[in-house]
Structures are given as C-alpha cells and as structure tokens.
Amino acid sequence: LIIAITAGARAEDDGFTHGISLLHELKYSADFKHFDYVNPDAPKGGTFVGYALHDVRHFGSHWSTAIDTAAGWERTYDRLIIRSADELAGYYGSLAEGIHLSENHRTLTFRLHASAHFHDGEPITSQDVKFSFDQALATVDGMLFLDWIKSVEIIDELHISINLKNRLTNSNLLLLSYEPRILPYHYWKDRGDTTAITLEPPLGSGPYRFADFDKGYVRYERVEDYWGASLPVNRGRYNFDAIRYEVYRDATVTREAVRKGLLDFYIEPDIGHWVRSYDTPAHQQGLLRKEELYMRDNAGPAQAIVFNSRRPLFSDIRVREALALAYDFEWQNRAFWYGARKRAMSYFAGSSFAASGLPGPAELELLQPFRNQVPPRVFTEPYELPATDGFGRNRHALSRAQQLLTTAGWQLKDGHLVDKAGRRFEFEFLLPAPDQQRIVLPYIDGLRKLGITASIRLVESAQWVNLMQTFEYDAFIQGHGTTQPPIMMLPFFFHSNAAIKPLTFNKAGISDPVVDALIERAQQAVSLQDIITSCQVLDRVLLWQFYHIPLQQEEPARLIYWAKFGRPQQEHLAAHQPIIDFVDLWWSDDAMTARVDAALNVR
C-alpha cells in the first residue's frame, strides 16, 4: 500500500503531505509546478459558449433535489482535493494545503490553505468544511454516498478531521475529489436549508462566479482575484474570462445552433448525425472541427436496458435471459449506427476490470466460497450474447429464448405468451425522451415473435423522477458507464442496500448477498490487482444473472467545435477526467477567433 510519499515527494515534519494515493505512487512530487497536461502560460480572456439540456431553475445545492442545478455551477466552489487527470488514483490538495492519514487509515485530516477565501473576502475555515459535510450528510443522497463517514471534527481554524467507519478506500478519495463543495457557513447560517430550490446565486469561492442568467442561459465570469489561481493544481486551467451556457432541449435545434456558430462546442451523441450532419463549408475549411476523444475514465455499457426484478414478471433468471436473447444488437448497429458501435459484454467493458474467458486461479479462489450461490455457468462458460448477421436473422437466439420461457412456465396461446393462470406476458418501457424509441421499437418487434407484448410510455421529467424514486416501472434505458477504477459506484449500482433507496442507480433491484460481499471485498482491497480480481468476479456473477441487457460499449466523445481555441500539447494525457473538463484546459486564441468570426459574418 503506497500512501502519498513518492520519489521526489517529501512529508512535512508534522506528517502532512501534498497528495495521496492508495493504489500507486504519486506522479507529482511535493514541489511540482503544474500538471503535465496543461499549458501553464495559457493566456486569459475570451468567452466560451457551451450548451445545457435543462432550463435554469435552481442555483442551490444539488443534494436530494429533483431539479437540476444550473449547468456549470461546480466551478463556483472549491474542493478539498482534486484527482490528477493523468493518473488512475492520484489525489492532490486543492483547498487542502496538507493531507494526513492516520496509521490505522481511519482518520483523514486536512490542513486548509490560510489564504483561501470566499468571493466576499471571508476566509474559508474548518467551520465551513464541517458545515458542508453536515449539510450533505443530512440529505438522502448524502446519507447514501457519504455513509462511510463516522464523524467530522474541527481541530482548529485550519485543521479538520474526517473519522471513518472503516479503513480509507480509493472510493472515498474519489468521492472527496468531487463532493462536497465547500459552502460558506456565514452566508447560509441565516438563510436556512441549503437544499431549498432557489434562483438566488449563492456565494462561492471557486475560479468563477455567477454573472447573470435567465431561464434560457447562465453566464459565469472568471474571478480576477481567485485565491487558488496560482496553486500547482490550478495553473493553466480556468482560462476563459466568461463561460456561458445556452439552454437547448432539442438535439436538432442544438445541432443547428452549432452550425450557425451560436455554440462553440457540442458533444454529438448520435453517430448518424456525426457522420452526415456537419459536412458544411465551415467544416471543409477547417473552421468547424470534428474530433474523437478516447477517455480512460469511463468504461462499461454506455447504456443498458434495465428490468425491474422487484416485479414478479422479471424475478425469474430464465425470463431475464430470454429477454436478453431477443435483443438484436447487430441489426440496430447496422441500421442506425453505421456499424460503428461495439457491444458491451461486461459491466466494465473496455477496462482491465472486465471479466474475459473463463475465471483464472485468483478469480476461482475468490469464487470458491460462493460456488453453491451463483449460477454454475460462472465457472464453466465465458459470458457471451448471441451475435447475428445484422439483417434480422436471429432465429437461433429466439428459439433458445422460447425454450427458457417454456421451462419458466410460460406457453404460447393464440399468439400470446401466457402463464399457467392465463395471464399474458405484457410490460411497459418507460422513456423520458422520444429519441430512445428507436432503440426500443425494434426490440418490441423481436419480443412480439415470442408472444410478448411490450409498449412504450413517454413521460415528462418531473413524472420520470417520481416514478424512478418509487420504483414504478417495468423497464427503461439507463446510462451505465462507471468511472475508473469502478469501486466508488459499485454500491450504488449493485448493492442490496441501494435496491431499497430511491435515489440510487440500482434500478434493477439487485439484492444478492454474494454481490454485496464482492463489492465490499473490492472496496477494502489494498492493491490494484486485488481490485481488478474482485471486479472481474463481480462482473461474472452479475452478467450471468441477466439483470440488464448491456447495449453499446462506452464510446469516444465525439466533439464538434469551432476552431477558436488554443489547446495544450499534452492534453491527450488527461484521460482520467470527465470530458467536459477539457474546456478548463483550453483558452481563447484571438487570431483564430477573428478568422471564425469573419467567416460567420460573411455567411
């Protein structure tokens, strides 16, 4: 186990260090000046115009609210630590000047920068940090995501300790690199609930502050005297003087806005439009650019069809397998996606955490205690889903599906699949967006060949949230990619505790003691190899129970952007970060911007 002290790093006399890693040596020493993937001399200036998918309706906390916080809000706050984007699990102090982990790994203490202050000039102290944790832990989301915290203790004005229920894990560090954002106690103490819906932009401390907004846009301005601007973790980042998000709820309208130059940047989710919608004169002149970015931070299925196993209809593993066999991925890939998509055959597809082939010796050792509790095929067969020729000829898979349904007690009668009581096999796909219908409709046609009747119900966002929280659905399409390493998200996607809590990702209702044990094993692993083995075994156990139908593997981010920006030479190193964070590495190039503006004005 390697904790913080690495080649070139030095601990201070009191044991505090500049960074921490539980899985590998830190790349950057205590005297590092900036991350390798930035341009430390990037000029400041200009405006970046991005897009948002929802109206500006809320500026407060995102904990336990059904309304999305305004796009870009996270840049107005500071975090205790941040994750280096060119390391798997390297974390460095941001608001925290120093980090100390106790010998038993159950107390994590932070020393705050004495110079840190909020945008109103008030210093950031331990009281603000404790207040932020207390507020988060009082919410439903916080109780779930932060349940590993035993207590938060103020030592003095600049020192605060987080006492843990168990040993510190990489999952804990990864979460701390995102949450909680540090809130000002002096601002909130007389304002009440930090989670209340509000259109009053709150006080922050980050590199940007709220400037102005309306229902259809929000604009942020760079804080000239941002206290953390010269920190090594921030040099070369946050270069735009202003960042503006325009709200576009319809993808067709968004694409048109990009082509007209109303937006600087768009992540194209549809491979068909990527191929055919941007062959414009501006693209041919090199002004409107297309680029695929391959990220290592996400893996697994980008999407999966989820069946609610809490419902009797989907509680039988044979039924779930039959439903998986009826899905013809290859036909959809050919017909809709130009054959560009790769099917996910693992919950961690595209990473070293994915199971492949038959289990090896280390996996077998971990599996052995559960031999009588998992499907026998976990030991004897590599997991595969049937592949077709892409032209709708999946007769063999449907025949196998029919056999499984028969053994599960279903039979065909007058073209309908019925149980012993004569009840038809009928269920509903709940969809929040019309564009998902083209995934579901061909699948419904395949199910009809088995005598199964499936329908679609489109719902608006508020109703969708309510139905998700109350588990009132049969099936739907869920985003299912996981960060790397995936251990932070495992409890929320797969643990039985999450199956009964409304604000989690365990929408399939997975409740399996073997799965729980494997998740806990992965989280307590003390080496990267132990995490890999635990995840591979977990992968096999989950796959062979058919809770989901994995769809396409996580794909490269397909960027459409105007050639107005400078970019770091080593930007490609930053593969362990959310795709939208690349914007924080770019800068406005005056000459390039003038060229684009001139071309747009001519049009």
Go through each PLM region and give its residues.
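A short beta-strand/turn structural motif
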Residues: 130-131, 148-149, 169-212, 231-240, ...
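Aromatic- and charge-enriched surface segment that lines or borders ligand/interaction sites
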Residues: 28, 38, 42-43, 65-72, ...
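Extracellular/periplasmic solute-recognition and catalytic clefts
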Residues: 151-154, 211-221, 246-311, 318-322, ...
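Surface-exposed binding/hinge segments that line
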Residues: 111, 144-190, 205-214, 357-373
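N-terminal lobe/hinge region of extracytoplasmic solute-binding protein
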Residues: 11-104, 111, 134, 203
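Gly/Pro-rich hinge or "lid" segments in bacterial periplasmic/extracellular proteins
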Residues: 77-89, 177-242, 249-253, 260, ...
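Detector for C-terminal structural segments
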Residues: 14, 52-54, 67-71, 214-218, ...
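A structural "hinge/loop" feature
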Residues: 16, 34, 54-72, 92-97, ...
